[in-house]
Amino acid sequence: MTNIRKSHPLMKIINNAFIDLPTPSNISSWWNFGSLLGLCLIMQILTGLFLAMHYTPDTTTAFSSITHICRDVNYGWTIRYLHANGASMFFICLYTHMGRGLYYGSYIFQETWNVGMMLLITVMATAFVGYVLPWGQMSFWAATVITNLLSAIPYIGTTLVEWVWGGFSVDKATLTRFFTLHFILPFITLTLTMVHLLFLHETGSNNPTGIPSNMDKIPFHPYHTIKDTMGALLLILSLLTLTLFAPDLLGDPDNYTPANPLNTPTHIKPEWYFLFAYAILRSVPNKLGGVLALLLSILILVFIPMLHTAKQRSMMFRPFSQFLFWTLIMDLLTLTWIGGQPVEHPYVTVGQLASILYFLLILILMPTASLIENKLLKW
């Protein structure tokens, strides 16, 4: 008799994806972040669902409904801060996952990489519309400033902004549609995740060496399930520590002031995970130029597979590329820091230099270093 795990139509899919899946034996802990992202998504959907039961998407009551959740709902504050800090954890895992993909050449699986890019954009959109919902000062002004960037589009810009706003300013219509989008986008993310896994399992996982590992594979369960469980426990521990000891560490104090269209905060800035892109946006003096630089800073990742000039897939044995990769990471950290600083000297200059270096590294320096390495290895 065939094992039900291998014969049942539904169980068979789960079995082939999480139990009997042939996995390279040498994948390191950097490969844990995919499963951690899945865990983050499930946690965000669950906490978000409970928050949506008590939240009211109306300009007059949105802020007070958040206060009500924190004060009157049983463990409402826990759910709220788990959701807010869960988003930070989500982006930490997301950026690490992408960094691993860049370092080890996982982008060679183009379909998986492209679906991953779609996931990145969807998650970023979800986080942005979600940031507007508490209807605090920073929520309101971040929504106003970022959506207003659409007005830089020639000819149709102003019409487009008013269409997104649902009026002549960020108001009730905007809040309602942002809540609707914030509710539906995680489920779109969930669907895209399944497509992402589908494409990944067509080729099998990459590994640190970048060399095909068909000769040396092990079943996913129990080896990698144990490894993933360890990662999951560490993630939950970090999230709980952050939520219970420093829930407002990554938030903005301005969001504890109800939204006021007549009073602009001194420094308008998004959440920390968007600061690198915000710094690139601000470093271009021209509005349209800034918007294009912002878009390109994210969309440039789509072209990474085309910019791969190395004969080797992974950076494991390529010291020049390794040096440039870590320079890129430092550059992104610098941009993140600059994005949170006021627009004044010397931050403006540092931001402009870091922005130039970001594009220079990806478009010119890294492909050139790969070609030099090919020559040195006589390939």
From Swiss-Prot:
Protein's cellular compartments: Mitochondrion inner membrane
InterPro entries listed in its UniProt record: Cyt_b/b6_C (IPR005798), Cyt_b/b6_C_sf (IPR036150), Cyt_b/b6_N (IPR005797), Cytb/b6-like_sf (IPR027387), Cytochrome_b (IPR030689), Cytochrome_b_C_euk/bac (IPR048260), Cytochrome_b_N_euk/bac (IPR048259), Di-haem_cyt_TM (IPR016174)
Residue sites binding heme b b562 per the record: H83, H182
Positions of a ubiquinone binding: H201
GO cellular component entries: mitochondrial inner membrane; respiratory chain complex III
Residues that, per the record, bind heme b b566: H97, H196
The protein's required cofactors: heme b
GO molecular function ontology, one term from the record: ubiquinol-cytochrome-c reductase activity
This protein's UniProt keywords: Electron transport, Heme, Iron, Membrane, Metal-binding, Mitochondrion, Mitochondrion inner membrane, Respiratory chain, Transmembrane, Transmembrane helix, Transport, Ubiquinone
One Pfam family hit: Cytochrom_B_C
Miscellaneous: Heme 1 (or BL or b562) is low-potential and absorbs at about 562 nm, and heme 2 (or BH or b566) is high-potential and absorbs at about 566 nm.
Role description: Component of the ubiquinol-cytochrome c reductase complex (complex III or cytochrome b-c1 complex) that is part of the mitochondrial respiratory chain. The b-c1 complex mediates electron transfer from ubiquinol to cytochrome c. Contributes to the generation of a proton gradient across the mitochondrial membrane that is then used for ATP synthesis.
Subunit structure comment from the entry: The cytochrome bc1 complex contains 11 subunits: 3 respiratory subunits (MT-CYB, CYC1 and UQCRFS1), 2 core proteins (UQCRC1 and UQCRC2) and 6 low-molecular weight proteins (UQCRH/QCR6, UQCRB/QCR7, UQCRQ/QCR8, UQCR10/QCR9, UQCR11/QCR10 and a cleavage product of UQCRFS1). This cytochrome bc1 complex then forms a dimer.
Database matches in PANTHER family: CYTOCHROME B
Protein name: Cytochrome b
Originating species: Physeter macrocephalus
Lineage: Eukaryota, Metazoa, Chordata, Craniata, Vertebrata
Gene label: MT-CYB
